[in-house]
C-alpha cells in the first residue's frame, strides 16, 4: 500500500475546488447548496450542503469513472489489498444486489451462509437464484452466529460444482471474520 498516496481524498478535494468556482446551481439537488432550505443547513451544517452537488464533469461520473472517482476507487482497492473497489451510492443493499444480479441467473446456485441480509434474499428472488446454505456455528456463550467454516464451504463447493458464486458475510453483523482468503481460493479453484 502506498501510504503517501493514501493521504489523498480525490473526491473531497474535487468538491472543495468546485465549490471555490462559485458555480450557480440550476440543477439538482433542490436545496441549492443550502440557499433553498435553511432548515437543512441547520440540520446538516453549511459545509455538508455546500458540497452536495450534482455529478458534473470535474466531479466525474459514478457510472463511468475516469478521474476523481476512479482514483478514489483505486485508493480504496489499494487500502483493502483488493484487485478492484467500486463506490456505491445506494448503500450496501444496492452493492449486494448488484453483485448477485450480475452473476446469477434463474436456476443458478449460490453458496451462502444462512444468516445473510434480506438484500441477498431479495436479489436471489429477483434473479431466480437457488441458495445452497452453509449454516454457521453458534457461540453458545455469547449467543451469536460465527463466520463460515472453511471445511463447510469446501464441502458445499464439492457437493455443488455447478454453483456460480460463493457469498460471504465478512465480517458478520457481530464482527466475526471468516477465513476469506482461503474461501476465495476455494471458490476460484
Which residues does each predicted region cover?
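Active-site phosphate-binding strand-loop segment of PLP-dependent enzymes
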Residues: 142-189
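Gly/Ser/Thr-rich loops at beta-strand to alpha-helix junctions
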Residues: 69, 90-95, 116-118, 172-176
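N-terminal "arm"/small-domain region of PLP-dependent enzymes with the aminotransferase-like
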Residues: 1-67
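Conserved N-terminal alpha-helix of the aminotransferase class I/II PLP-enzyme fold
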Residues: 46-94
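Substrate-binding/gating loop at the entrance of the active-site cleft, primarily
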Residues: 112-131
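Conserved beta-loop-alpha segment that forms the PLP phosphate-binding cup at the N-terminus of a helix
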Residues: 84-110, 123
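Short, acidic/turn-prone active-site loops that include or flank metal/cofactor-
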Residues: 115-118, 135-141
Amino acid at each position: 500500500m502506498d501510504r503517501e498516496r493514501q493521504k489523498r481524498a480525490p473526491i473531497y478535494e474535487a468538491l472543495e475546488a468546485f465549490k471555490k468556482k462559485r458555480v450557480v446551481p440550476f440543477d439538482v439537488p433542490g436545496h441549492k447548496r443550502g440557499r433553498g432550505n435553511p432548515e437543512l443547513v441547520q440540520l446538516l451544517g453549511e459545509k455538508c450542503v455546500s458540497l452536495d452537488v450534482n455529478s458534473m464533469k470535474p466531479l466525474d461520473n459514478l457510472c463511468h469513472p475516469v478521474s476523481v472517482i476512479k482514483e478514489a476507487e483505486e485508493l480504496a482497492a489499494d487500502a483493502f489489498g483488493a484487485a478492484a473497489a467500486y463506490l456505491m451510492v445506494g448503500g450496501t443493499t444496492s452493492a449486494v444486489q448488484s453483485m448477485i444480479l450480475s452473476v446469477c441467473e434463474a436456476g443458478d446456485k449460490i453458496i451462502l451462509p444462512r444468516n445473510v441480509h434480506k438484500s441477498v434474499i431479495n436479489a436471489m428472488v429477483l434473479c431466480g437464484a437457488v441458495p445452497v446454505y452453509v449454516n454457521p456455528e453458534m457461540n453458545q456463550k455469547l449467543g451469536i452466529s460465527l463466520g463460515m467454516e472453511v471445511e463447510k464451504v469446501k464441502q458445499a463447493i464439492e457437493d455443488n460444482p455447478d454453483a456460480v458464486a460463493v457469498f460471504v458475510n465478512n465480517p458478520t453483523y457481530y464482527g466475526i471474520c471468516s477465513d476469506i482468503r482461503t474461501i476465495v481460493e476455494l471458490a476460484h479453484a
